[in-house]
Amino acid sequence: MYDFIANLRWRGMIHDITPGLEAQLQKEMITGYIGFDPTAPSLHVGNLATIMLLKHFQLAGHKPIAVVGGATGMIGDPSFKSTERKFLSEEELLHNQSCIMKQLKCFLDFSSSANTAELLNNIDWFKDFGFLRFLREVGKHISINYMMAKESVKRRLEDGISFTEFSYQLLQGYDFYYLYNTKGVKLQMGGADQWGNLTTGIELIRRKTGEEAFALTAPLITKADGTKFGKSEQGNIWLDSTMTSPYEFYQFWLNCTDEDACRLIKVFTLLSKEEIDNLIELHVQAPHQRILQKQIAKELTIRVHSETDYMQARKTSELLFGHATAEDLWELSEKDFKVIFKSIPEVHITLTQLTEAEHMLDLVASTGFGIMFNSKGEVRRAIQEGSLSVNKEKITDPLQKPNLKLLQDKYLLVQRGKKHHYLIKVS
């Protein structure tokens, strides 16, 4: 069993912590929880830092609980949001809860050990909780002044905040109180933007029971340039393979900058300090090998998806971005071709469009603009810059006749620059 707080400190995973928590953790095995609002049918990489808090908490011998916010998700957390969230239907919330629970099982141990993880849903204790009872049992213990002092509320006052969202901190505070009473939960964890909600729960427990509870938050992960972490050009990077393919997930981590990778490997892997220090030293000696990025991508792709998905994603990356030749493409079996390129964006043209195209500009235009290119001028510039190839053969003249052999008798593999690949399917 290792020291939970010391482990988080060297990993840079502590933003705020209440006094006394470290001593309490050394006294006994305690139970802690993190809440996840089911606002989408999948968690995304922005949630991973808090999921890793629960993982390290369990590895340190403590008991983790993940609470899916079936009740609080009907409102949406206003913490540091600029506008009020759109309400989801009950059916959407139930579907999202089910999906999220499956994903959490990839990280936490739900075996029968002493500190087995638990999954709970706060709709179970809120569904029969009437408004008058809520005012008596919760509202009377927390003053308006206390609630107004929260930074997350202050930021919304000028533009207006609804009573629904203003009351959110009371709901989350009651979650903590309920779990304290029924499960012996003494610790709530979350992202740095959750500090106000966490301390409301601590205050409610103190006022109703006179007992002490604790909170810990992890820093919100940002890139080295200060921008939000967890998004690509296409939007959020999801943990669900139908929303973000294993290949795209793998590529996201592989494309991290060296500066980001040095921080992220501490947050998102379970490697020891010695192992990480050794990898960083090797990476500094040969940064072009992207040792850190490959390690992060491997560990997370296997954990979130599977080892098979990782192997396929790696093989696809090597074929697309490595030193593969046109001959390597022709040698692929149809089965391997489908597996390797299943994540590549695909556009469709007819055989007639292919044969009647007089030059490469016509061929690309026949696919329709908006996916590969936005205009013929953009295609022409790419060719002039030497950044366009088809089936691993560089296109040098925008007016050359597209006398191209189809892969698997129906595909053309288009590469634009180093990172963008597309399939043209001919039927």
Swiss-Prot record:
One GO MF term: ATP binding
Record's keyword terms, sorted: Aminoacyl-tRNA synthetase, ATP-binding, Cytoplasm, Ligase, Nucleotide-binding, Protein biosynthesis, RNA-binding
Cell compartments where the protein resides: Cytoplasm
Main subcellular localisation: cytoplasm
Catalytic reaction(s) noted: tRNA(Tyr) + L-tyrosine + ATP = L-tyrosyl-tRNA(Tyr) + AMP + diphosphate + H(+)
Positions of short motif 'HIGH' region: 38-47
Keyword Nucleotide-binding in annotation: yes
Amino acids binding L-tyrosine: 33, 168, 172
GO cellular component: cytosol
Binding-site positions, ATP: 231
EC number: 6.1.1.1
Gene3D superfamilies listed in its UniProt record: HUPs, RNA-binding S4 domain, Tyrosyl-Transfer RNA Synthetase
Segments forming domain S4 RNA-binding: 358-426
Pfam families in the cross-refs: SYY_C-terminal, tRNA-synt_1b
Example GO biological process: tyrosyl-tRNA aminoacylation
The keyword tRNA processing belongs to this UniProt entry's keyword annotation: no
Motif 'KMSKS' region per record, residues: 228-232
InterPro entries found in the cross-reference section: aa-tRNA-synth_I_CS (IPR001412), aa-tRNA-synth_Ic (IPR002305), Rossmann-like_a/b/a_fold (IPR014729), S4_RNA-bd_sf (IPR036986), SYY-like_C (IPR054608), Tyr-tRNA-ligase (IPR002307), Tyr-tRNA-ligase_bac-type (IPR024088), Tyr-tRNA-ligase_bac_1 (IPR024107)
Enzyme class: ligase
Matches recorded under NCBIfam families: tyrS
HAMAP family the UniProt entry points to: Tyr_tRNA_synth_type1 (MF_02006)
Family: Belongs to the class-I aminoacyl-tRNA synthetase family. TyrS type 1 subfamily.
Role: Catalyzes the attachment of tyrosine to tRNA(Tyr) in a two-step reaction: tyrosine is first activated by ATP to form Tyr-AMP and then transferred to the acceptor end of tRNA(Tyr).
Description of how the protein assembles with itself and partners: Homodimer.
Name this polypeptide is given: Tyrosine--tRNA ligase
UniProt organism field: Amoebophilus asiaticus (strain 5a2)
GN (gene name): tyrS
